Amino acid sequence: KTRLEEVNKGLTKELAMREAKRCLDCAKPSCVEGCPVNINIPSFIKNIERGEILNAAKVLKETSALPAVCGRVCPQEKQCESRCIHLKMNEPAVAIGYLERFAADYERESGCMALPDVDPANGIKVAVVGSGPAGLSFAGDMVKRGFDVYVFEALHEIGGVLKYGIPEFRLPNKIVDVEIDNLRKMGVHFQTDVIVGKTISIAELQSKGFKGIFVGSGAGLPNFMGIPGENFINVMSSNEYLTRVNLMDAANPETDTPINIGKKVIVVGGGNTAMDSCRTAKRLGADVTLVYRRSEKEMPARLEEVKHAKEEGIRFLTLHNPKEYTADEAGRVNGVILDVMALGEPDSSGRRRPETTGETVKLECDQVVVAVGVSPNPLVPKSIEGLELGRKNTIVVDEQMRSSRPEIYAGGDIVRGGATVILAMGDGRRAAANMAGQLLS
């Protein structure tokens, strides 16, 4: 298996049609309530059941700018599928995520990709800061309503976290590029290498005639634990590790910025980013141990990611938490001292709080990837005058996704602090509906 090859191969048409038959087409479909972008789930599934796959894809695109992406990376088991009526009958939920991916992939491979209808141009310019899922979703909905949409991206590639954060074995870049290409065909303009707040200010954008601005700049600032030894060589954030491997070909020693390829790698964390990091390290030939302070039951990662990580031979060391790192005389990390943890009473997240037992163990390692969450990059919010900020430099918004400055809306991780692709897309959709209402009234 190659390093970039996608692990989940998707459904065949026969399997998809058989699975679609299981959908009971409920009169009150609770699955739709579980979807942050309100996809008409029974409608697209019944189209698949009839063999009308292109119509199914059309239904998906009415509400989702990125169906092939969501079919791959959404935590369906916590959203739409968790509301499926079959669960009440002690049966497995309809595989909504697999079916969404099937319809989107089928349409792409058929060569008959339909574009959603676009309203006549209204001549109003809007700017989007960041080209991740929130920005792309917002851009798609605004261009459909006839707005002149410009997306400004700080990196050299469009796609935000879909490109730099999620490895290709889970979400191939070419899939993301097709979705971006569709937005281009609909009329969205993209500009890379533009840091709003540095390259160009919000005031300058407004002087260029932009009437509304949506900030979807994400959470690119990695969290660390603040323990001794985190500054040793080869201790890095998952953010840096994945960005370099995914976007900058850093696994290739011939590149300008090669990464240290560890033989014994420790990944700290229990979310999807931790799974992506350990599965990436495994593909680079490492012996990988995942260290997580709670038990496996409390891991926030998608069940499918945990299953794949285990199948690929990742060692799980739960109820352990790094206390400090050790290094050789050159300052390169060579080990980690771990606190052995036990679960206490539930905390505010509803999960049982991990507490130290007083016991420690030591592991050898030559690389550590820290995946304990991210915070919004303060650069964009701090560069906007009169903007109310929350904890950790998040942008404070109302229900309509409007900030304390009425012409500026925001969504995704810059508001939430660190969430999922689909929640960011839901924010982008809500912001688009409300900003369009404001600008057209």
Each predicted region: which residue ranges?
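Glycine-rich dinucleotide-binding loop and its adjacent helix/turn
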Residues: 103-120, 178-198, 222-284, 389-404
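A conserved FAD-binding loop/helix module that cradles the flavin
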Residues: 277, 414-441
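Iron-sulfur cluster-binding cysteine motifs and their immediate structural context
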Residues: 25-50, 69-101, 154-157, 187-190
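FAD-site-proximal beta/loop scaffold in flavoenzymes
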Residues: 231-262, 346-418
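Rossmann-like dinucleotide-binding cores of NAD(P)H-dependent redox enzymes
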Residues: 148-151, 155-191, 278-324
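Ferredoxin-type iron-sulfur electron-transfer modules in oxidoreductases and energy-metabolism complexes
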Residues: 2-20, 40-72, 90-118, 245-246, ...
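N-terminal Rossmann-like FAD-binding beta1-loop-alpha1 element of flavoenzymes
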Residues: 124-150, 274-282
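Feature captures the FAD/FMN-dependent oxidoreductase FAD-binding
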Residues: 55, 120, 125-129, 177-227, ...
